[in-house]
Regions:
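Glycan-recognition patch characteristic of GH18 chitinases/ENGases
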Residues: 107-199
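Primarily a LysM-type cell-wall glycan-binding module
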Residues: 6-27, 50-77, 100
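Structural preference for beta-strand elements that scaffold enzyme active sites
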Residues: 114-116, 137, 169-173, 216-218, ...
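Short, structured interface segments
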Residues: 40-57, 94-107
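Non-catalytic accessory regions flanking glycosidase/transglycosidase catalytic cores in CAZymes
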Residues: 19, 33, 68, 79-137, ...
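Substrate-binding surface in catalytic domains of secreted glycosidases
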Residues: 147-154, 230-233, 238-301
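Active-site groove signature of glycoside hydrolases
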Residues: 202-231, 281-295
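Active-site beta-loop-alpha junctions enriched in small/polar residues
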Residues: 118-122, 143, 175-177, 222-224, ...
Length: 301
């Protein structure tokens, strides 16, 4: 599994009278570097209480004429991917100019962690490109299926190709979304209770993953009827048993719960223990606790 490491930084909280020049002087970093790292734009007005990220690099490099990211990486014993991760101002591109300061390394590693990000096929490619260097997985949202277990038509070729270019593992998000764009408990119930449809979906899923270059699947069934909890876990296990020998990773997306006995259609069929053991990994959807359309509350239980 490819994982991402942390880096050292100071978070400067803007005080009355602060300027970018003063902040740069205070923390001994070049002003252009501070501007680039925070993606600030003229006229660079600051507001008290605003936070400015001040990276604390261990080793830097000043770009010379004729340099490329590849040549800089080779000269300094690093990789282009590491340069992208250390220099968000590059936006995942190879655009550099003489005199520009690049961070080669940071001293204190905070640890290692796997990062997943969701994307619609319609995502702004500039946003995707600047984000990919920081991801381990890219979950392409989403694909559905019909009552016979056939995968519905979709196109994710570009996202899969870009993910692979940035050494990110693309995942296909399999959902029970209906034609109205809402999760359908009825669709989940039909699938989980018709053996031929389940078997067909699993085989069709294996074919799609292979044909389109995915590294795995994220199974995201929401509002599953409580009486189908065991059948849902069994389905996820069957998917893993079919896909694991081919090297695919199977994720289960879990609704955020405060207890195993939590009531509600979103939660009751999501048995953490059963789904956790059935899948290779789990994605805890804390973003479904407090979100834009919910009552005012915290973003995770």
């Amino acid at each position: 599994m490819q994982e991402k490491g942390g880096f050292s930084m100071v978070i400067h909280v803007v005080q009355p009278g602060d300027s970018l020049y003063r902040i740069a002087q205070l923390h001994s970093v070049p002003l252009p570097f501070l501007i680039q790292q925070n993606e600030l734009h003229e006229p660079y007005r600051l507001t008290p209480g605003q936070t400015i990220v001040v990276p604390q690099p261990e080793k830097t490099y000043i770009v010379r004429r004729g340099d490329t990211l590849g040549s800089i990486a080779a000269q300094n014993g690093t990789t282009v991917m590491q340069l992208w991760q250390n220099n968000p101002q590059l936006g995942g591109t190879d655009r550099i100019q003489p005199g520009q300061m690049l961070v080669l390394s940071y001293g204190n590693k905070l640890g290692r962690f796997a990062v997943n990000g969701y994307a619609y096929p319609s995502i702004d490619l500039r946003v995707l490109r600047r984000t990919l260097p920081y991801l381990t997985y890219l979950s392409v949202f989403s694909v559905g299926f019909d009552n016979a277990g056939r995968i519905l038509p979709f196109s994710a070729e570009l996202l899969v190709r870009m993910a692979r270019q940035y050494q990110v593992k693309p995942l296909l998000v399999l959902t029970t979304l209906g034609e109205d764009g809402q999760f359908s408990g009825e669709r989940a119930h039909r699938l989980l209770n018709i053996p031929t449809a389940r078997a067909a979906l699993i085989e069709n899923l294996a074919q799609v993953l292979a044909m389109q270059g995915f590294a795995g699947v994220d199974i995201d069934f929401e509002y599953v009827p409580p009486e189908d909890a065991d059948a849902y876990a069994a389905f996820v296990r069957s998917v893993r048993e079919r896909l694991s020998p081919a090297g695919y990773t199977v994720f289960a997306a879990l609704a955020p719960k405060t207890s195993a006995a939590q009531q509600g259609l979103l939660y009751e069929a999501h048995d953490y223990a059963a789904l956790g053991s059935a899948a290779d990994r789990a994605l805890l959807m804390t973003y479904e606790w407090g979100y834009a359309l919910s009552a005012q509350m915290e973003v995770a239980p």
